[in-house]
Amino acid sequence: MIMYDQVGCGKSSLPEDPGVYVKETWAEELVALRKFLHLDELHMLGQSWGGMLEMYYLTSFDPQGIKSVMIDGSPASIKLWVQEQHRLIKYLSYEDRAAIAEAERTGDFTNVKYLAANDRYMEKYCWDDPDENSPEPLRRPTNGKRASLIAEGPNEFTENGTISDFDVTDQLHKIHVPVLVTSGTDDLCTPLIAKSVVDHIPGAKWHLFANSRHLALLDQHDEFIHVLDQWLAAND
């Protein structure tokens, strides 16, 4: 199993040049990684942005040797993602909705009321703030916030970065490898978002994790590992 930190995060380099943080960079990085490690055949699993990168890679680079793909909690369209995030915001308290609306209106994402509202939003649909009982990877220092800010934007519902126009929905028909889409019932990646991916990939399958937010691997760990094991065994 190979896991890697993309350029701009983790232990990889953190370039100052904002022009680096575009989808093309990360796709070319994946191409280079496969070549360097001689990964002629492989299974791929991408979570959130990782799944978006998979879709872009598969539809734009015509890669060979892909035995199967798992797309976990990822949109094919940022426009649909933003629409769904604003729908999810409606389930927050009036005070939190107002704080988020004011931040989006003014462009000020430093206000303490907004920050608290966004924290509650992420806890509801993504994952809790890490504590001493959280899995070790979540307790590591976070490197790469600048890359996320440049590529995505200040949060999940104000997408104004370099990938704000990301939309490969009409290209998904080009994918002709086994694909499993996964998502949670209480996920930032709503069932509508996940279904929009499944419906456009020939033969794609979908597993919906009950009572799971954006990190199904953590919310439904045993079920997630079981689904992954079965998927790999069926396509290896």
Region roles according to the model:
Residues 104-162, 171:
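Conserved alpha/beta-hydrolase catalytic His-Asp/Glu region
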Residues 9-12, 77, 215:
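Active-site loop signature of alpha/beta-hydrolase-fold enzymes
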